[in-house]
Amino acid sequence: MTSYAKLSLFSPAKINLFLHITGKRADGYHNLQTVFRLLDWGDTLEFLVTQDSFDPTAPINEQHLLVRLSSTVAITAQVMDNLVIKAAVALLQAWQNSALTRSSDPAVTPHLPVIEVTLNKVLPTGAGLGGGSSNAATTLIALNKLWGFHYDIEALIKIGATVGADVPIFVLGQDAIAEGIGERLTPIKLPQHQYLLLNPAAHAATQALFAHPDLQRNVPALSIDEIKAAQSCYLQQLNAPFSNVFEPVVTKLVPEVNQALNYLRQLEALTGTQARMTGTGSSVFLPIPTDKISLITHHLSNAGAPCDYVLTQSLDKNGQNPE
């Protein structure tokens, strides 16, 4: 067991500075290349050890209560589909599948406490900001401590990849180049930046986007060294060979995203930077130089924006890495 009784952890958003599909895999998934950037804007999760307990060796099913989840927004109708619950189940399954861990770890007791989880939701869903994946990663990190499993970050990343393709970056907790389906991560040092994010209240289904005939699926893969050396092409600008291959498809299918992106493009003359979409949408963002923040703030206060927006900055710390 552990001495932790309660944890409160930040669950950040991410943006994709670019997003390429480099080919289709034998398993039906697509290989991607992207640079993930974590933001100082996100949800908060509170984890409380309760007096209730469960047998961690028992089979896991819907009646196997590992955590009690409450949220400031509506939770998935089928609770087992919630990524917080999926993360808890994946962590326990990994422990159950490791006889070595069970036999050699004196910190693990015959019974583990049920954890009460409160999700204070800020991030919009279906926005390409990774909110659900971030919540799942934060849950893995918290329960790893509270249940005394002592998995290292590499192990948690592997477990996270079974929950969702974007979960590993949030377990890593820092900006990174991602390859594969998002699970192969190479940390990258990027300068601090501010961003204006617009969050339209509409989005296209990810499955439909991957199936769309106009989606570019064969962008030539770049080496890690090439991506690191070309930061000036995707940090404040988005120049060839970098792009978000989903952006032209989403802007055709979702007028609200196109409207938000056009709004940001009108500000490019003020900022000298380039707007783009994150992930598969629907959020779009514009890098804002420090000396332009007051100008953009003044513009927003006078002219407003076509949808919800937030001014934020890149996360300047290592995030949620486990101890």
Curated annotation (Swiss-Prot):
GO terms for molecular function: 4-(cytidine 5'-diphospho)-2-C-methyl-D-erythritol kinase activity; ATP binding. It holds the Pfam family GHMP_kinases_C. ATP binds at residues 124-134. It catalyses: 4-CDP-2-C-methyl-D-erythritol + ATP = 4-CDP-2-C-methyl-D-erythritol 2-phosphate + ADP + H(+). Its EC number is 2.7.1.148. SUPFAM superfamilies: GHMP Kinase, C-terminal domain, Ribosomal protein S5 domain 2-like. It is an enzyme of class 2 (transferase). Pathway: Isoprenoid biosynthesis; isopentenyl diphosphate biosynthesis via DXP pathway; isopentenyl diphosphate from 1-deoxy-D-xylulose 5-phosphate: step 3/6. InterPro entries: GHMP_kinase_C_dom, GHMP_kinase_C_sf, GHMP_kinase_N_dom, IspE, Ribosomal_Su5_D2-typ_SF, Ribsml_uS5_D2-typ_fold_subgr. The keyword Nucleotide-binding applies. Catalyzes the phosphorylation of the position 2 hydroxy group of 4-diphosphocytidyl-2C-methyl-D-erythritol. Belongs to the GHMP kinase family. IspE subfamily. This is 4-diphosphocytidyl-2-C-methyl-D-erythritol kinase. The lineage of its organism: Bacteria, Pseudomonadati, Pseudomonadota, Gammaproteobacteria, Moraxellales.
